[in-house]
Amino acid sequence: IEGIEVLNIERDAGIVFATDEDIVVEDLADDVAEAPQDGGEEIAAAQDAPSPAQPASAPQAHVPDLDFTAADATRVLIAWWTKMRPDQLGAADSIESLCDGASSRRNQLLVDLGAELSLGAIDGAAEADMVTLASKTSAMARGYRPFGSVLSGTISDHLAKVLGPSGKRPAFIGERVRDVWQLGDGWVPHVTAHLAMATREGTSVRGGDFGPSASLAKADDVANAIDTAISEVALAQGLTVTMPQASSGEGATID
């Protein structure tokens, strides 16, 4: 019969059962046709892929970090003890003059200063002016790390009370300094101390408020107060920093 091909079931099993090599080759051809030629698509995809983003909290090199020294701690402790703002301490002031000759107050301040800096007694500290005392404490307490035993408790207790209504803890200060402003770790004790000093009740013995009288009842209030403290710390250091734009991924800038 013409048109009918007679096959041997053993010899031509591949054709009979549709497992012949022609089908396999056709499938491979389809795979090759669908695959990217010369790796073009893979290269394009690699070129289009976004580069890894830098961590938002990484401090930026163009903004200098700060160092909270023994001299800084001395100034903060004296200003806190004498109920003044740090900027109101004059170069000629001394612990003796600031305590108005009250030996009990003077002696307690000297004890606290020695404890904060882990120095014990500091010879001549009572009579030394602020410039001399700063130089002396910096030289004697080179290994100081903020905060010491006195300021850590004083500042922490005060901030816990002040920030309590907002639901924020003192650690929020460091988080905002590092993660939002992208400043170095050295800024944290400066901003923390500044915020604590500025939120004390009452007024300075040398006149004027300690800081803004705005309420810190909400989280946004606390954030704004921290931002203000950062700007004021920067100004005291002769710097001007700007909060980075949320979408830019860049760090705080300095003028």
Predicted feature locations:
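4′-phosphopantetheine-dependent carrier domains
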Residues: I1-D255
